[in-house]
Amino acid sequence: MSLRYMDYMSTISSDKLHEGLFAHGMFTEKLPPIFTSENFFQFYKSTPDAFPKSLCQKPHGVIYFESWRNTNVPRLYAIPHPIAYYNLCQCLSDHRNELKTHFAQQTHAQSHKVSRIHIRKQKNSKSLFAMTYHNWKIDASPEPDLQIGNRYMVRADISTCFQSMYTHALPWALVGKLTAKQSKADRTVWYNILDQKSMKVKNGETHGFLIGPHASNLLSEIILTAIDNKLVTADWKYIRHIDDYTCYVPSYEKAQEFLIDLRSCLKEYDLSLNHKKTKILPLPTAAKPSWIYTLTTFQLIRREGHITYTGVQAYLDMAIGLMLTHDDTAIINYAIKMLEKQSLTQNAKSYCLKTMLHLSVIYPYLIPLLPEYVFKPYHATPAHIRKISEILYRSAVTSKNYEAAIYAIYFSLKYKVELPAVTAENAINSDSCLLKLFVWLYFEKTGDIDSMQKMRDHAAELAAQDFDGYWLFVYESLPEKLLVNEWQIMKHAGISFIQDV
């Protein structure tokens, strides 16, 4: 049986909401899996008076980094200051009942669950958010029902959704603009407290939610479900994947009306449509992109139950052709995962390994897939991993693609291979906190005392210039005696945000 939107929130207690958003939602999944906020969560939860109140009330800057998307365009992600983010998650946890009431009020009229990606419990995980999580037993698929009797489909999305949202729009959505404006000076009401906490994770700015931390997804849903309520009340039949809308209508004129209504609802929260991605398409349309069927129905050449060299070559050639035609690296992603499930001959494995390594240098979006879907199934040797890590690192430093550089160092740490191209100067001359951190971790692992000292000296300079913007590197590299305020308290307690690789 499918669940209603409010049912998902009802299954999450206040404590689990706090833990899920902070301990398992502070660091985005786009990062190499070496980060943890669990130690800090347990420390702060067990000793809530550990930090002076004056330190807890301050706004803080964030660490920014770019991650490549399947369209070969980078997206800007963020890592928040731990105290500011903890306090935001605590606020959301404290007011879980009010949030539950809000979501119930905004979604009660829905005949199906409009929002498809949201905070929820997940099987075998304490995290409360995942872009790709789906449970067919309780999520259902409303699209076939929505299509019946309709002739057109509208696709639209919000222009720079998270970056365009205002923290002040949270009270607007929660209690209405009139009440919010009448009480905007009252710092004691919970919705204004939430506004303030949301500002403090972004250096006191009112404009934009951080991309990456899971709390941002809950904040955005506060606003987006309020917009949903107006659209559902107007009897529009649609679904929403965060900021992507798909609406089913009987005529082209109705499609235009939907866009007018959507534009009007978004405007109330100072949001706008991305006109480049707005489309009105005649029905019927395929349920999935055509390239998926092409890949899944392709007859792979086998010998004695194993896919041959020729079979893998033909399959990857086809996948590359589809990727170039559709300009979407996700197609190679899909093909890699399809092949990983198959039994290949040794020659086929070797070809697959070398081709994927070749493609990962050209398309950085594929790099995070390498450990699970390439190195492991195709038995990459230390020599293979060292070679590709060296190529990735040199290319990345030259092009300032620091995501590729940190993954190259991560591979060297995980698989215990040397990376001679890594120098302290690479990190010091960059503006990337994460590159500085990973270079520090590399020298710490290899025991390069001289380079470690260079990095420590650099960290001390950054501590005086822009601690918040580089806090992860500065905190992890400097000893307790060179830290001050909350950082010294955390270091004394033995807290680290890095797990053993």
Where are the language model's segments positioned?
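Polymerase palm active-site segment centered on the conserved acidic dipeptide of motif C
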Residues: 252-310, 314, 318
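Intrinsically disordered, low-complexity segments enriched in polar/charged residues with Gly/Pro
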Residues: 64, 140, 224-225, 266
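Conserved two-metal-ion catalytic palm core of "right-hand" nucleic acid polymerases
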Residues: 1-188, 193-211
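Conserved polymerase palm-domain catalytic core
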Residues: 144-241, 247-259, 304-501
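Hydrophobic, Leu/Ile/Phe/Ala-enriched alpha-helical segments that form helix-helix packing faces
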Residues: 88-99, 173-174, 227-231, 262-266, ...
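Generic alpha-helical propensity signal that fires on short helical segments
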Residues: 106, 171-180, 227, 263-265, ...
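General structural signal for secondary-structure boundaries
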Residues: 2-8, 12-14, 81, 166, ...
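Short, surface-exposed helix-loop/turn micro-motifs enriched in polar/charged residues
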Residues: 76, 80, 237-238, 272
